[in-house]
Amino acid sequence: MKFTIKKEILLDALVKVSKAISTKNLIPVLAGIKFELKKKKLTLTASDNDITIQTTIESLNDEDFKIENEGSIIIQGKYILDIVRKLPDEYINVEVVDELKIFIYTDKSEFNLNGISESEYPNIGLE
């Protein structure tokens, strides 16, 4: 999975879905946000098993949101939100390497996170 997106677009989506994440959840994978990138769309999903919030960002032009490779992964919600919020740059690159390693970078900064396989995320039945 690899894409480049305007910071404000990604941050807006992360803020929306992160409202469903509980810090007291007994299921560790639910502390994450599921990123699904396919068919020119990025879908973010977060849930605490009671409330689920999902939002979709469409790639209408390559200037605001450019998709290079499709894929899906779960990224810890608190970490990704804090990183994106603090980045000073206008564009953010997100790349998954070696299946579960997430590389988030801009012109001036770079971060490495460990992801969780999307197969571990519970099926919440939204479509």
PLM region spans:
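Structural preference for solvent-exposed beta-strand-turn elements
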Residues: 1-127
